[in-house]
Structures are given as structure tokens and as C-alpha cells.
Amino acid sequence: MSRQWMTLMAILLVYIPVAIDATVLHVAAPTLSVALGSSGNELLWIIDIYSLVMAGMVLPMGALGDKIGFKRLLLLGSAIFGVASLCAALSPTALTLIASRALLAVGAAMIVPATLAGIRSTFAEASQRNMALGLWAAVGSGGAAFGPLVGGMLLEHFYWGSVFLINVPIVLVVIAINAKVVPRQPARREQPLNLLQALILIASILMLVFSAKSALKGQLALWLTALVASGGAAMLTWFIRKQLSATRPMVDMRLFTHRIILSGVMMAMTALITLVGFELLMAQELQFVHQKTPFEAGMFMLPVMVASGFSGPIAGLLVSRLGLREVATGGMLLSAFSFLGLALTDFSSQPWQAWGLMTLLGFSVASALLASSSAIMAAAPKEKAAAAGAIETMAYELGAGLGIALFGLILTRSYSATIVLPSGLSESMAQQASSSIGEAVSLTEALPAGMAEALMAAAKAAFTQAHSLVLATAGVLLLLLAAGIWRSLASVAKPQSAL
């Protein structure tokens, strides 16, 4: 085997745990909720902090790679990822796990641009480079798609920390391999590093998400929630103005003035919001309501994972034959139909209907995702292709983080509003049981058998009703977005084969 392909194998090996970690916690959410005694809000932060931090860090880490060399960045990111995985596996509380997941995101944000730079510098020939990038994309989508299944397999036999602990030996091996195999790239010391701007971007996103969660949960005084939201909005405004005035901005905000690029970003974010949010909701529904094990839940969701992970070539062919506008709008419409159908489906008595709709959902979401990438890259000027790609990467990570936050917020709010608690619970117990189904499950362990059974029945009924509302809401919003996408992409020319 040539050194080029050995380098690619080493790069892909370090990328695998990063891709898996984006979704591995989805089936672990119920287990984490019970094991750590985390609230519904804490559980959402445990899962979505990874994508939200990564969204703000991936761009400055690319600049850091230019400054110190991408091999050093790859090794440093791998080391941080390994240490953070160990910290996460040993976390005694929800807050320490949230901090560990944030550190994991920092390591992952170093690894992603380093792997891409390694591929670009290793493969000079365009055909080989495209093949290598295709394999990199397949590892990313496949790892994310099968993350819940991997998590389910580990939780079936080991404690919850195993979903993080498995990264440690992998990281040790890949550090040794990459240190020897990956060639050193020259560093460009003059490359500016906008770390402060990245931190302000992350802070603004986290403050806005936190204020939205607090407003819906009623956890803070209204004035304090408004103050946090105002601070986040002010930081985001400062960041945007800074990017517009910079000669070498971290994010080229002027690209958002192009309607097609803006539509592509909206599609990318929406696709990730719906896919990631749906997987998290399904994992809790299957385990808490239908009493499936983590592995059984992962297997039940396999159709959406397989369809989303392997629909790329078909979607690409459809774009070439039918046109970007048609595939983008069609993907949104089919996704909306899938969500509306799943909202009316009983997963216990109608499994085949659920699997069929999930397969359609996975394919349609992935088609919309490919269409978004095509729209962004086709509309961006050639000299700004890298900047457009960076914006697309941010859209993916923000979509993943916001999907967990939005689906989780609507689910929690609806659950709390609809649960009918059995009599005999104290005020503190009633508040705990109304917070989330995970906390209701934890509470049943301290109750008499009859009361525990009544509470579980009430929690399951409320969660099922909330789950249907969330999916129906997502379906309606996708219908509205499809109409907007159809209008905004009206200027995109059809391919010759479609004329």
C-alpha cells in the first residue's frame, strides 16, 4: 500500500470517533437521565453542548492549523479528545459531564479541519483527492448514522460511561499511527487567529439557547432571562459587525446576501435540526414508553440511519436529472409527510409503518442536505468557495445543536403541560415528575408499587401525546419551509437532461 493511502487510513481512523460522538448519546439519554439524576434541561445541555461549541470553534481551529501546521493540530486535537473522553466517562454529575462534552467539542473542532487539510495536502491529483474526500464524507455520515446503534450495543453490556471510555484506546492508537504516518505540513505563522471572536460567537449562541430554554421552562425571573438574551444578541451583533469590517473575516457574512446561498444554509440547518432532533426524541420514546433496551432502540431506528447514510449517490443523480429546486423542495415535502405520518403511528402495534416512514425520512432529509450543499457551492464565487464551505460546516453543527434544543424544549413543555399526576404526591415530587419523563422514572423507585405504576402510566401517556405534537409541528414547519425554498430557488437553472 502506498504512503498516500496509509495516510488516508490514519486520518479516517481518527475521524471515526468524532463522527460517532455526535450522535452516540441519543440512545444513552434515558440511561444518563436516571444514572446521573439529571433534569430534562441538563440532559439537553449534555447532548447539544457538543455541536454548539463545535460550531463556533471549527473555523478558528482551521486558522490555528495554518499557524502551527495541521499535523500538530491533529495530534493536539486527538490528545484533547482522549482526555475529555476519559473525563466524561468518569463524570459524577451532569454539570461535569456537560463540561467534558464541551472539551470534547474543542478536540473535535481541531480534528475536523486537520483531517481535511491532510487529505488536500496528501492527494495532489484531483481524481484521487475527490475519492479520498468521498471516503471522508462516508465515514462522517456513516459514523453519525450508526452512533446510536454503537451506543446501544455498549449500554447493553456496560455502564453509561463506556460510550466515552471506548474512545480512549482508539485515540492512543491513532496518535501513535498519525505521529508516524501523517507527513508534517508547513506552518504559516502570519495566519491570523480569531480565537476571541470564536469565543464571543460561542458565548452568544449559548446565551441565546439558554435564555430560550429558561423562558420555556420558567426557571429564571423574566428580567434575568431577558438580560441573558439581550447579552447574547448584543454579542452576536458585535460578531457580525466585526466580520463585515474585517479584511480577512472568520465568516464571510456577505455571502448571506445571496438568496440561493441563504436558502442552502437554511436547508442544511433544517435537515440537521429534524434528523438529530428526531433521533433524540425516538430514543426516549422507545426506551421510556415502549420499554426497549438501548440496543433494541438503536436497532429500531436503523432504517432512518441507513437511509440517511447511504442515499447520497441517489440524491446526487436526482439533482442531475430533475434539478436542484425540485430535489430540495421534494425532500422537504417528503420529510414533512414522514413527520406527519410518524405523529399518527403507534410504534408498538405498527412497527412496519414506522420503519417505512423512517426510511422515507432518512432519504428525504439526506436529499435536502445534498441539495443544500449543491446550492451553496454552485452559487458561491470560485474565490470564496472555502468561505462558503466554512459556512456550510457551521450550519451543520448549529443545526445539530439546535435540533436537540428545539425538539427537547417543545417536548418538555408539552409533557409538563399535559401530564395528569396521580394523587398522593408531595409538591416536590409532583414538580420533579412534571419536569421530564426521565425524572418521573427516577421518582418511581422511591414510591410504593401502586403509586409508582400510576405515575409511570401518566408519564407515558403525557410523553406519547407530547411526541405526537412535536412531530406534527415539525411536519407543518417543513411544509412552510418547502414553499419558501421553492420560491427562493426559482432562478436556479434546470439541468439539460431535465429540459
Role assignments for model-derived ranges:
Residues D48-G62, V112-L116, L302-I314:
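Central cavity-lining transmembrane alpha-helices of secondary-active solute carriers
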Residues A63-L196:
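Helix-loop-helix hairpins in multi-pass membrane proteins, especially solute transporters
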Residues V34, A84-A89, L104, N178, ...:
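MFS-fold secondary transporters
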Residues Q4-I20, L25-V27, G40, L196, ...:
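12-transmembrane solute porter fold
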Residues G134, E156-A268, T274, L281, ...:
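Hydrophobic transmembrane-helix bundles of small-molecule transporters
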Residues L32-S33, L64-G65, V150-F158, A212, ...:
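Interfacial helix-cap and linker-helix signal at transmembrane-aqueous boundaries
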Residues G37, G69, L90-T96, F158-Y159, ...:
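Helix-breaking motifs and short loop linkers at transmembrane-helix boundaries and internal kinks
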Residues A28-G56, H290, F295-E296:
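Extracellular/periplasmic helix-loop-helix junction of adjacent transmembrane segments
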